[in-house]
Structure formats: structure tokens, C-alpha cells
Amino acid sequence: MEEFTTRAQLLDVVRRLRADLDAAVAEAGAERAVQPGGFDELSFKDVIAHLTGWRLVTAARLEASMRDEEPVFPWPEHLEEGVDLHAINRWFYETNRDKPLEQILAESNETFDRVERAIATLPEDALLTPGRFDWISWSDHGLGPAVVRGAMDHYRVEHEPDIRAWLQQG
């Protein structure tokens, strides 16, 4: 497992994730990206919106740490991240399903920008020190490595194989 111990490594991972997703979007093309059914009942656009929603959580965590606050997540307050995963994913879908692809892609890019900006500006102590924030009870790593690892694994393990298979189907 790749270890992230520097700001430069974290930024590199985020930039590689962006480049890989951008390449998949370019390969798919706009017409194919919005067709339902490529991912169960979902379109590639829906998958991008899902990834964007969770990247928004990454941005919220990083930005909250800049204010030394706990993060506030985009979904309704009654939903809990560790408990209501399917409901949160459904909320992401319902919130984004009627948006045009161009808006979904713009929001995706904005979340990447926010994550990169936060990683670039957070003090190293806040970014890399394990145990610095009490609300990161789900990881033994510092905030930066924890959230970047989560974003990377979410894409690479849970979604990239399906995206690659779908792209190969042409």
C-alpha cells in the first residue's frame, strides 16, 4: 500500500485521479456518458456525480480543518456517514440526476480544485499529523493521507474497474 507522507505526494495522487477521470470522460464522449444502463441503471454521468459528491466530503473535511472545525457534509442532517451509506448515495443521485453533463463535470472539477487548494495551503501539522483532529476516528493517519487514501481507494477499487470495463464495451 502506497504511503503518503508529504504534501507533494498527496497533490500528485489527487492530480492523477483527476487526469484519469478526465481521460475516461474524454474516451466515453458526451453522448455515451449520459446514456443510462452502463452501471446497473445508472449512466456514467451519474457515476461522476457520485464520485463528485464523495469528493465534496473530502473537500469539506480538508476545509473544516483549516478553520479547526468539524466538517459539515452536504446531505441532510438526519443521515450519518457511517450508518446511512445507501441513503447518502441515493441522495447524491436524486440531487444530481437532472443536471446536465456539463454542470456535473464543472462541479467535479471544482471539487478537485477545492481539494488541491486545501492540500496546498493547510499547514503541514494539520495535513500530516495523525490524531490532530478528534473527528478522524476512522483512520490512524493524518487528515491528508486519510482523506486522499479514501478518495483514491473509492475510485480505484470501487469504480475504476467498472468504468474501464464499460469503456472497453464501446
Describe the role of every protein-language-model region.
Residues 14-17, 51, 108-111, 152-155:
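Hydrophobic/aromatic residues within well-ordered alpha-helical segments
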Residues 18, 22-29, 56-63, 109-123, ...:
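Structural signal for well-ordered, non-membrane alpha-helices
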Residues 1-19:
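Extreme N-terminal tail/first-helix region
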Residues 83-129:
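Acidic/histidine-rich alpha-helical segments that form the ligand environment
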Residues 2-6, 88-103, 137-146:
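Acidic/His metal-coordination segments adjacent to aromatic residues that form catalytic metal sites
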Residues 34-87, 127-170:
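Short, contiguous alpha-helical
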Residues 13, 24, 65, 91, ...:
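Residues that form generic nucleotide/phosphate-binding pockets
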